[in-house]
């Protein structure tokens, strides 16, 4: 899990996106402050040396040195720049929570892939054990055949059962390889470098899930918090679009020094300045401002409805996950009973086979029932673990309340 958080490429891309959003927020916030720039120049010119009568009067050379500084500031009377900056900040917050969404999805996918790897390994071990059991029964049937108490049909049926069990192993190994490859992608490693050795679903500690989970836990879901931030950004954009209907007021100042002699450039008599105030009121723009305002209003409404749907969906996700945990727990318990009864029936049929009192049909049926019960138990264990992972994801990363802020790029 820790490795996936640090090296997963999806998380890295999401982190880069919220770094971009932070930069965009700083760009938008710059409009709230004055802009200041400075400059300097040296200008050389020479006048013509020819008079109107065509006589030469000698040209004049002029050198001008200038050092200046200019400042401009837009008075944000109507809050256009303030709302635009707030919208950018909320977008940056939304991108942080989007990174958390990607991280949560990655962690749950890693858990699911790991559990699938363990389940595949368990099923392969079960299949190999079943092959050994079936081969042991085949040897006993062959002994009966040699003793004259068995038939060719008995041997052929058991051989078919052994072959069928052996044929079940390659698909399981293929599934195991695919799950390991999926795990390798999540931790950004070559598949051949990922090894899960000796693990089993039986060793996984199952966390206790209380039935009375508080609804406040849903507030830690990053997708809900992302939608909240996106809605806040859209609301600020509406304010910025509304402000475009009103005049914009710009203040511009320019000051500096200008002299034909560099040594006298910063003398008091060489100073100059100017201050200009201007106001611009939109009169006719073909409906651009109105269209932009209506667009931002519609976008705000869209995100409001999306937010409502996300909240409703979150309750459904939790309910589905809790129901899945309950049903898979019941299934696992019942499947354990099935396995115990099947194992007992198989042991009795094997004893009767060796005593010569069991018919081959009974032996075949008890074997098949046991083999299916063992494989179904592994699948039931996996289903319960996947249900717990789905609840973890539905609650935004656990079932314990926590105070948590989104990850900051800085």
PLM region descriptions:
Residues 191, 205, 209, 322, ...:
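Acidic, low-complexity, intrinsically disordered peripheral segments
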Residues 153, 357-378:
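Short terminal targeting/anchoring segments
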């Amino acid at each position: 899990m820790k490795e996936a958080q640090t090296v997963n490429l999806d998380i890295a891309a999401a982190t880069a996106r919220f770094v971009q959003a932070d930069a965009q927020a700083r760009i938008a916030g710059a409009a709230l402050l004055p802009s200041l720039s400075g400059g300097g120049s040296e200008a050389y010119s020479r006048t013509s040396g020819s008079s109107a009568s065509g006589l030469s009067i000698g040209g004049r050379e002029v050198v001008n040195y200038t050092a200046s500084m200019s400042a401009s500031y837009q008075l944000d009377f109507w809050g256009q720049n303030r709302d635009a900056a707030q919208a950018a900040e909320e977008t940056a917050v939304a991108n942080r929570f989007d990174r958390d969404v990607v991280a949560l999805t990655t962690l749950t996918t890693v858990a699911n892939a790991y559990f699938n790897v363990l389940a595949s390994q368990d099923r392969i071990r079960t299949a190999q054990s079943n092959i050994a059991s079936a081969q042991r029964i085949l040897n006993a049937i062959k002994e009966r055949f040699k003793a004259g108490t068995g038939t060719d049909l008995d041997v052929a049926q058991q051989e078919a059962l052994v072959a069928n069990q052996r044929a079940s192993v390659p698909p399981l190994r293929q599934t195991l390889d695919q799950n390991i490859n999926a795990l390798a992608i999540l931790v950004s490693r070559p598949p051949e470098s990922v090894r899960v050795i000796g693990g089993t679903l039986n060793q996984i500690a199952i966390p206790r899930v209380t039935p009375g989970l508080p609804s406040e836990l849903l507030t830690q879901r990053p997708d809900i918090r992302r939608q909240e931030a996106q809605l806040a950004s859209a609301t600020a954009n509406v304010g910025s679009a509304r402000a475009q209907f009103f005049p914009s007021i710009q203040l511009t100042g320019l000051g500096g020094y200008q002299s034909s002699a560099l040594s006298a450039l910063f003398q008091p008599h060489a100073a100059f300045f100017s201050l200009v105030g201007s106001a611009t009121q939109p009169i006719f723009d073909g409906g651009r401002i109105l269209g932009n305002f209506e667009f931002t209003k519609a976008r705000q409404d869209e995100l409001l409805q999306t937010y409502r749907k996300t909240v409703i969906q979150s309750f459904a996700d939790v309910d589905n996950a809790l129901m899945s945990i309950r049903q898979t727990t019941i299934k696992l318990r019942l499947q354990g009973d099935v396995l115990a009864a099947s194992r007992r029936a198989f042991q009795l049929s094997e004893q009767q086979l060796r005593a010569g009192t069991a018919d081959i049909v009974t032996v075949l049926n008890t074997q098949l029932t046991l083999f299916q019960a063992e494989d179904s138990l592994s699948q039931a264990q996996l289903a319960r673990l996947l249900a717990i992972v789905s609840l973890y994801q539905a609650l935004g990363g656990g079932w314990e309340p926590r105070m948590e802020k989104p990850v900051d790029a800085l």
